[in-house]
Amino acid sequence: EFVNEVQNSNQYYKEFEKEYKNFQIYQKKVAHTLQILHTMCEENEIHYQLAFGSLLGAIRDDGQIPWDYDVDIIIPTQERENFIDCLKHNLPQNFYFYSVEQDSACEHFITRVAPKGYDTHFLHVDVFYVAGLPENQTEAQKYKHEIKELTLLYKAKKFDFRNKKTSSKKELCNMVAYRIKGTLKKTDDILSRYNRIATQYPIENSQRYCLADRFSDWYDFPSCTVF
């Protein structure tokens, strides 16, 4: 259906079918990566579920969104340590993961899993972590703000201004501002603070949850919708 839509649109070009077949090969590799993670999580009783576009694709398209190149899943922050430990000991040798626990150069708090031989920037399963929220709305807003601030401070500390390709000038300016803001803060202290804050409110004891990263104020959902 997607291919037919493109063929009948003004976006169609001569090499589309050939390029899309190549693209589907990468989609299959990502889907296989998800299968590996699914087995690992089931065997180790780690709670996870599809999220965002990946969840939409599973429901609407009975698989991946036709033009989506990655898969997104969410895991409770309380299970992060166990999940990372499982990746270290149980992930097949032909796969690898990228996270702050595995690579000191990592600038974000999500985890990416990919087949070896592929850059996690381009082919991956994105693992986002979610945290419960305090019941008081004002406290919940403060909590989400602190998670966002810690995430951006950490990213700015690790940001490579010499070699990094930024998506926009706004992103670059944002990183400069947070680098200055975090001048007197140690990277390890930011990470330790984040780990304490992100696990403060277990989802099972909370009515709502948010993403435990820079998009914490974008995603705020009832806890009954997960796990």
For the regions a language model picked out, list residue spans one by one:
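Non-catalytic N-terminal targeting/anchoring module and adjacent flexible stem/linker
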Residues: E1-N4, E15
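Conserved catalytic core of two-metal-ion nucleotidyltransferases
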Residues: Y12, K18-E42, L87-E135, A140, ...
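Active-site nucleotide-donor binding segment shared across nucleotidyl transfer reactions
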Residues: H38-V71
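Helix N-cap motif at beta-to-alpha junctions
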Residues: T77-R80
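Conserved SAM-binding loop
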Residues: N82-D85
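Short, His- and charge-rich active-site/binding loops that engage polyanionic ligands
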Residues: Y143-E149
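A short, surface-exposed interaction/processing loop segment used at functional sites
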Residues: L150-A156
